[in-house]
Amino acid sequence: MIEFLIGLIAAVVGILVGYLIARKINNANYEIFLEQAKAKAKAIEFEAEGILRNSKISVQEAEFEAKKAYEDKALKLQKDYNAKFDEISKKEQTVLTEQEILKDSREELEKEKKSAQTIYDEGTSLKKTYETKVEESLKLLERVAGLTEDEAKSEILQKVEEKSRAEIAHIVRKYEEEAKKEAKRNANYILAQATTRYAGEYAAERLINVVNIKNDDLKGRIIGKDGRNIKTLEMISGVDVIIDDTPNAIILSSHNLYRRAIAVRTVELLVEDGRIQPARIEDVYKKVSEEFEAGIQEEGENIVMDLGLTKIHPEIVKLIGKLKFRASYGQNALIHSLEVAHLAGIIAAETGGDENLARRAGILHDIGKALTHEFEGSHVDLGAEICKRYKENPVVINAIYAHHGHEEPTSVESAAVCTADVLSAARPGARREVLEAFLKRVSEIENIATSKEGVKQAYAINAGREIRVIANAKLVNDDEAVLLAKEIAEEIQAKVQYPGEIKVNIIRETRAVDYAK
């Protein structure tokens, strides 16, 4: 039993040992197999990568070959296209050239066709004319053959009359030429008569007046303390007062004759009175201005009376007096108008016109010049407007327009005024062009200043090198005065041509007055 148990145990132990040994052997084989499997897997992976690389290379080579083939084909197609395009362009140019040649040929053909048609038409016309003449000749022969004696005489007289008309036309032209020569001789005779029968006084206007004083001590009194007197006089009169080394003389300068005349009379009265101060200067200037206004009316009435004219409106009479203080090209406007009036009257009388009406038109032909300092526009339009307003004779209005070519003269009197105007203005020495240009420039400068808002008066002084502007203190303050000066200076610079520079001087003054009772 024990032996059986020992044998059984030994058998169990043997089996267990065998199992363990077998298991160990199996584990060793498994690891070997695993390593072999891994090695095979790596070999397969490496082979797959090689195949993949070879595939990529093959694909790239295929793409490159395909791209190259495409580019070669595209280049070939482009070359073929360019060749075809050049060929088509050449053919198109050839076609255009042939079209131009065809067009020119067609135009030449049309010209030749028209020329041939013209020749044909002319030939047809000549043929018709020839046939007409033949028919007329045949009819004439038939008519002559069948004419009576009276009919033949009538035919002859008709031919003679036609021939006589040509001779009469020649005679008329001859006498017309002789009449024109005679009219020219008569016109020259009338002009000679007019110029020799009238000799008016004349002196060219100047830009200065000289006031004589007793001694040079008065110059200091006229200047006044700190120049107050001379500044006041220049400001209210708009005239340059020049006090220099000239002994016993004060010079007044201005382009405006009226302002200068008032200033001259004011200085004369101040020197005569001896009281020279700003308030006194203003009083005397105001008094002299009123006297001149009355004197203008009286001057106009005297001129109208001397010319023997009647029924002229008082406003027009006043304007006639104002012409004394106007000048054109250095020629006094009133003296010029008087010359025109007298010459026009003589010419009208010689040519069968109304002498008094011609004088009336002559004295009024430049009446607009009395208004040019106050209103815009030409003196022709201003003069015609004032005469229409006061119902002047239509001949006078026509003369105003006609003497500057705005209308044709419609009467003997108007033509006489035009002729007299040329005689008075065009004679040597009557006018000075340079002076007129200067006066026009100075007037334009003053007009620019007075056109601004807040400006009461403006005077150009120092030969137009300075413009003195009197501003309204209620409308213009100190800051606005600076802007006003700049604005006037800029407009003068833009619109007026002048040498050197022009000083714009704005004067703004405030006065307060009260009375102690």
Swiss-Prot record:
Topology within the bilayer: Single-pass membrane protein
Presence of the UniProt keyword Lyase in the record: no
Its EC number(s): 3.1.-.-
Localisation per UniProt entry: Cell membrane
Pfam families in the record: HD (PF01966), KH_1 (PF00013), RNase_Y_N (PF12072)
One GO MF term: RNA endonuclease activity
Residue ranges occupied by any HD domain in the UniProt entry: 333-426
Keywords, sorted A to Z: Cell membrane, Endonuclease, Hydrolase, Membrane, Nuclease, RNA-binding, Transmembrane, Transmembrane helix
Every KH domain range: 207-271
Recorded GO CC terms: plasma membrane
PROSITE patterns named in the record: HD (PS51831), KH_TYPE_1 (PS50084)
GO biological process, one term: mRNA catabolic process
CDD domains: HDc (cd00077), KH-I_RNaseY (cd22431)
InterPro entries: HD/PDEase_dom, HD_domain, HDIG_dom, KH_dom, KH_dom_type_1, KH_dom_type_1_sf, Ribonuclease_Y, RNase_Y_N
Segments passing through the bilayer: 1-21
Family membership: Belongs to the RNase Y family.
Protein task: Endoribonuclease that initiates mRNA decay.
Protein name in the entry: Ribonuclease Y
Organism this protein belongs to: Campylobacter hominis (strain ATCC BAA-381 / DSM 21671 / CCUG 45161 / LMG 19568 / NCTC 13146 / CH001A)
